[in-house]
Amino acid sequence: MANEKTLFYALLGVGAIIVVLSTTGYLNNASNLSIAILFAVFAIAIASVYEFREPEIVVKPAKPTFEEKVIG
């Protein structure tokens, strides 16, 4: 099964799309059960294909560089 965080973001995204489609009238004739099935199927499909990963942040310590110049 997919990662929990990936599944959460997939559910969130698919839920937002279904809300937009239902408020604009594209899902007027659909029953609540068919909308719920659409929601679950698309969210699980997206979560199984796409894996959410945290971005890797690499912190390199800044080292001061000194140049030695001989004057004379």
From Swiss-Prot:
It is a multi-pass membrane protein. The keyword Transmembrane applies. The chain crosses the membrane at residues 7-27, 32-52. The keyword Transmembrane applies. Keywords: Host membrane, Membrane, Transmembrane, Transmembrane helix. Its main location: host cell. GO terms for cellular component: host cell membrane; membrane. It is found in: Host membrane. This is Putative transmembrane protein ORF72. It comes from Acidianus bottle-shaped virus (isolate Italy/Pozzuoli).
